[in-house]
């Protein structure tokens, strides 16, 4: 199986979630072995996607280098992960990736428009060789060896609409587009009011976020699926795992995970070479599994 990029450049304009200003996003093809590279076109600064360049995980996953930052990269990266794209230039003219509708649907459509192009170099895949776990109180994320990527996520909120939700997701591009891509980010009205008081969430609205008051959902259209809340957490996790720089084969499990815990997990995996092996996708059985997943 070969490395991939996109066939041709595509672009869109949307609003940043926190600053609330228009952002132009451009996706461009890259040659083999270049990886995922972000670029602040307004500053002329290149930000390669690497764990050491993740500078904040409080409200979103934030990439930073020198004086340049790009926030809320996880939804776009989730779609990039699902489409098996290895090499891509992502340019923005402000400090956020556009939030669009709060899910990854728009980015899936954008990648469909761009098309996928095979390159000459063989694809690299990270295979987890032993269990790695990180914790924060009773919250945890872990990853264990497996012959495919699966994500088992549980959330538990003291809210009548959400309560406790769990979903086991076995990755394939088709399953991702059916179950995960449409799941929107969500927040609580009291938190939104606080965030706006400190200059954040200026671009947030019922058009790009599920908003809940103390007892109900404020969005008139309701949920897109029964498990939209936990499926969005899976969407986020796939984006955060893309910081590893390549697709991963392993069983991911999380209880009340977060961007912070996902970032800690990525760094913990890479901290010990015994935790993983980088495979060149030439093993027939594993290549077949990859081709099936990304079909």
UniProtKB/Swiss-Prot annotation:
It catalyses: a UDP-3-O-[(3R)-3-hydroxyacyl]-N-acetyl-alpha-D-glucosamine + H2O = a UDP-3-O-[(3R)-3-hydroxyacyl]-alpha-D-glucosamine + acetate. It is an enzyme of class 3 (hydrolase). The active site is at 259 (proton donor). Its EC number is 3.5.1.108. Gene3D superfamilies: lpxc deacetylase, domain 1, lpxc deacetylase, domain 2. Catalyzes the hydrolysis of UDP-3-O-myristoyl-N-acetylglucosamine to form UDP-3-O-myristoylglucosamine and acetate, the committed step in lipid A biosynthesis. This is UDP-3-O-acyl-N-acetylglucosamine deacetylase. Keywords: Hydrolase, Lipid A biosynthesis, Lipid biosynthesis, Lipid metabolism, Metal-binding, Zinc. It comes from the Bacteria. GO terms for molecular function: metal ion binding; UDP-3-O-acyl-N-acetylglucosamine deacetylase activity. Pathway: Glycolipid biosynthesis; lipid IV(A) biosynthesis; lipid IV(A) from (3R)-3-hydroxytetradecanoyl-[acyl-carrier-protein] and UDP-N-acetyl-alpha-D-glucosamine: step 2/6. The gene is lpxC. Its cofactor is Zn(2+). Belongs to the LpxC family. The keyword Transferase does not apply. Zn(2+) binds at residues 75, 232, 236. GO terms for biological process: lipid A biosynthetic process. NCBIfam families: lpxC. GO terms for cellular component: membrane.
